[in-house]
Amino acid sequence: MAEGSGEVVVVPATGAANGLNNGAGGTSAQTSNPLSRKLRKILDTRLDNDKDMLEALKALSTFFVENSLRTRRNLRGDIERRSLAINEEFVSIFKEVKEELESIHEDVQAMSSCCQDMTSRLQAAKEQTQDLIVKTTKLQAESQRLEIRAQVADAFLSKFQLTSDEMSLLRGTREGPITEDFFKALGRVKQIHNDVKVLLRTNQQTAGLEIMEQMALLQETSYERLYRWAQSECRTLTQESCDISPVLTQAMEALQDRPVLYKYTLDEFGTARRSTVVRGFIDALTRGGPGGTPRPIEMHSHDPLRYVGDMLAWLHQATASEKEHLEALLKHVTAQGVEENIQEVVGHITEGVCRPLKVRIEQVIVAEPGAVLLYKISNLLKFYHHTISGIIGNSATTLLTTIEEMHLLSKKIFFNSLSLHASKLMDKVELPPPDLGPSSALNQTLVLLREVLASHDSSVVPLDARQADFVQVLSCVLDPLLQMCTVSASHLGTADMATFMVNSLYMMKTTLALFEFTDRRLEMLQFQIEAHLDTLINEQASYVLTRAGLSYIYNMVQQHKVEQGPLANLPNLDSVALKAAMVQFDRYLSAPDNLLMPQLNFLLSATVKEQIIKQSTELVCRAYGEVYAAVMNPVNEYKDPGSILHRSPQQVQTLLS
């Protein structure tokens, strides 16, 4: 392509290639040909790796749509014109950008000038207000300090002063009610009074003393108001069943810090409840319960035991109820001696009923309803004394003393009644009945003793007290009975006396065997029975030996001495006499029951009778054994002793067993 004409010369590729091939060994003129170099460069170009060339060709294809000679010749001009148009468009666009930038630059310059002006004005204002800023800073610091001091003051007042509402609660009217808020305010006063002690250990001693004095005065005023209110509340507790309000319980808890006011309030409560209990006791005696149920206690005055029992039961229930009321009243009190306070107040409350109770029980006892009833009443009084003292301790001295006095009085009259009965036994001693059984006086006395002991066994008096009473009762009754029986039997024969005494002692023993605490007396009675049994055993053995013909022979054998010579030579001890005696003894062996003393049939105990028969039979066998040994002894010179005593002692024992 010639640079001046703008034409593009297209050389056929084949010809160019042939020219190159033919000139492989060509000259340097061919090598320096610019056209050849350009063609070679173009032909050697690798379009795949030349992205710029590819982009240029793509752009060329957008407007080079017709491949003709004319378009090829005008291509350079078209490209330049297109480039010029693009550059003009670019210049036009950048001109707009330049104008915008110039506008922005003007704005920025204006803003910069404004900022510079403002900075200058601020600097001038700062220089002018420097003193004001310093003063403001100082005032802010002072404000912070004052705010902190205000907070400290508020905290101080909150901790060491009461609010107006709390002051109103504590300084309320004299007759105004007490609520739970009152106790919260009172607790706050106590807390402040304790906390203010911290100030006394600092530089604020004056303030601490003033606050402490103020709180102490306020406390006294509050406690005085609380005491008056509690007194008024206690005076209203006059119903038989009183309900202790929670506020009154809190009041007693608070008053424990003032022992004198606490004691006065308890006294007021005790006085109110005392009149209520006395009125309730009189109503129970004369009017009965609501609607007549239960019936008045006085209606049972004809039944001494029930009459006394109902009165004591009512008092027991009332005492327990009053203790429960006091426990409810003082349940939050933690001071020492609460239990003693309860016992003391209950003692004061129940003291009012002692006089009417004592008068009525004395009337019952002095009327002497009988030994058994007196003993039951005595045990009843002892039981309630023990029961009530278990509920309230021994501090209720007046009531317990009254019950104890009535117990001792009934016990005294009871033993006087027994002693009188015993003295009557000795004043007129009966003779034993023909059957040698217990006398009517003995039977009556044993019936009385059985009833007394039965009531004693059924009582719920403590074991040690019951045992002591038992010993005294037995001594008061049994000793005169034994003496009466001995005097009554003193005019009888030996066997009759022993039989009568065994029957009487046996009745006493069977009566005592049913009850506790009688072991010692039973042993004593058994010893006396055995002594009289020995008498009956000997009498029965003697009775058998006499009627069986061996009594004289046995006595002679026992009394025989060697210097008297052989037994066979003594009078009535020869072989003939012995054989005659053995005939009678054989009759006894064939029917031993026919030789029983009549007195044995009067014995009340079959066991005792069998014992007497058994042991008396052993004595008979022993006597026969001694006689048999003496007869068989050659020294006594009996001829053919086997024909005289043809039974050995073993055979006799076998027959009698």
UniProtKB/Swiss-Prot annotation:
What keywords are assigned to this protein? Golgi apparatus, Membrane, Protein transport, Transport
Q: Indicate whether Transport appears among the record's keywords.
A: yes
Q: What quaternary structure, including any partners, is listed in this protein's UniProt entry?
A: Component of the conserved oligomeric Golgi complex which is composed of eight different subunits and is required for normal Golgi morphology and localization.
Q: Which organism does this record belong to?
A: Bos taurus (Bovine)
Membrane topology per the entry is: Peripheral membrane protein
Q: What does this protein do?
A: Required for normal Golgi function.
**Do you know which InterPro entries this protein is assigned to?**
COG6, COG6_C, COG6_N
Q: Is Coiled coil there in the keyword field?
A: no
One GO biological process this protein is involved in is:
intra-Golgi vesicle-mediated transport
Signal peptide start and end residues:
none
What domain of life? Eukaryota
The family annotation for this protein states:
Belongs to the COG6 family.
One Pfam family per UniProt: COG6_N
Q: Which residues cross the membrane?
A: none
Q: What is its main location?
A: Golgi
Instruction: Quote the PANTHER family the UniProt record gives.
Output: COMPONENT OF OLIGOMERIC GOLGI COMPLEX 6 (PTHR21506), CONSERVED OLIGOMERIC GOLGI COMPLEX SUBUNIT 6 (PTHR21506:SF0)
Compartments, as annotated in UniProt: Golgi apparatus membrane
**Identification of the protein by name:** Conserved oligomeric Golgi complex subunit 6
